[in-house]
């Protein structure tokens, strides 16, 4: 949450709504705190809020930032309750967290746990970085801007991170992470990091504008024709 020590949650029941360890608040969000979604009344607060927004405001989809901060059980309860209201509701999020968390790794709503959360989508950062290069390194190249030996990684992304006989999974923990293609949110850029054009410009400073336009079109073609 934006506030921590003086937040309404901390004032209601001090030490309950946030995770902590012997050093104080844990920081799975990267913002100084993380809600303890695995505790019954925290889960209830989250679920009840979502139900209210879905019923009263007719919201037809929810995106969960840093979904890895939340636990698998809570996400499954969310999906179950919201699909009772609207079976075609969209539920997806970032399948990672922003810092060290005290929540056991096997309980986190990570991308690696997607098969335990059917009907919930995850951003596919594998295809994002394969297409244009890592978002963390300016000069890192992807498939469209000159990167090499990326054919298998691209097939992995195009299939929507599900099992396929033409993909070698040894580089990905020997297994695909998605239960079904619909869990893979395919994208090449978003609100974080460089825009696609800026990434292509900084990674290929000698490329002409026409060349970068062609790269941009290839990025779109890959995303639009991938499963997911």
Regions found by a protein language model. Give the residues of each.
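Substrate-binding/active-site clefts of carbohydrate-active enzymes
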Residues: 1-57, 67-86, 90
């Amino acid at each position: 949450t934006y506030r921590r020590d003086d937040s309404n949650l901390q004032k209601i029941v001090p030490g309950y709504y946030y995770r902590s360890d012997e050093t104080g608040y844990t920081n799975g969000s990267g913002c100084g705190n993380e809600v303890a979604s695995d505790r019954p009344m925290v889960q209830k607060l989250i679920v009840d809020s979502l139900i209210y927004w879905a019923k009263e405001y007719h919201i037809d989809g929810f995106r969960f930032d840093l979904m890895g901060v939340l636990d698998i059980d809570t996400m499954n309860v969310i999906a179950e309750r919201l699909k009772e209201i609207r079976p075609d509701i969209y539920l997806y999020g970032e399948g990672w967290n922003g810092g060290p968390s005290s929540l056991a790794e096997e309980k986190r709503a990570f991308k690696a746990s997607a098969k335990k959360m059917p009907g919930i989508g995850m951003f596919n950062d594998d295809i994002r970085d394969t297409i244009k290069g890592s978002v963390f390194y300016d000069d890192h190249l992807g498939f469209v801007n000159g990167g090499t030996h990326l054919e298998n990684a691209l097939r992995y992304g195009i299939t929507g991170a599900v099992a396929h006989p033409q993909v070698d999974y040894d580089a990905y923990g020997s297994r695909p992470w998605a239960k079904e293609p619909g869990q893979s949110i395919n994208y090449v850029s978003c609100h974080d990091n460089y825009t696609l054009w800026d990434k292509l410009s900084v990674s290929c400073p000698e490329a002409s504008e026409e060349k970068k336009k062609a790269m941009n079109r290839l990025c779109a073609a890959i995303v639009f024709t991938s499963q997911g």
